[in-house]
C-alpha cells in the first residue's frame, strides 16, 4: 500500500541518518554494517520491526551498551530537550501551511496530538544526537 511504502521510506531515512551519526562519532564497523543490513531487510510496513532493532543498536552504540531510551537520566533528558526544539519548529511550519498534525502512520496514540510530527522530526534527530556523544 502507499501508506506502507511511505512508512518504509521514513524508516529507511531514519536508519540512514543513524548510520551517518555513527560514522561521525564512532570507529566501530559492526553497528554500521548491521544498520545497513536492517535497511535492506525492511519489508512492507516494516513488519519485521527493523526500525526498533536499529534504534536499539544505534543508541547503545552511541551512548553505551547499557543505555535505554526513555530512562530518567541526563542523556535522555538532553535528547528530549533537543528533540523538543526541533519538534516545535516543525509544528510551527506545519501549522503555517495548514497541515493537520493529528494525522499519522504507525505511530498512533490517543494522547499524542502531533502524530505527523513523529514522522518528520525523527528524521532530523541527526542534528541533536552527535552533540551529546561529543560532550
List PLM regions with ranges.
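Active-site helix-to-loop segments that bind/position phosphate- or nucleotide-bearing substrates
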Residues: 1-135
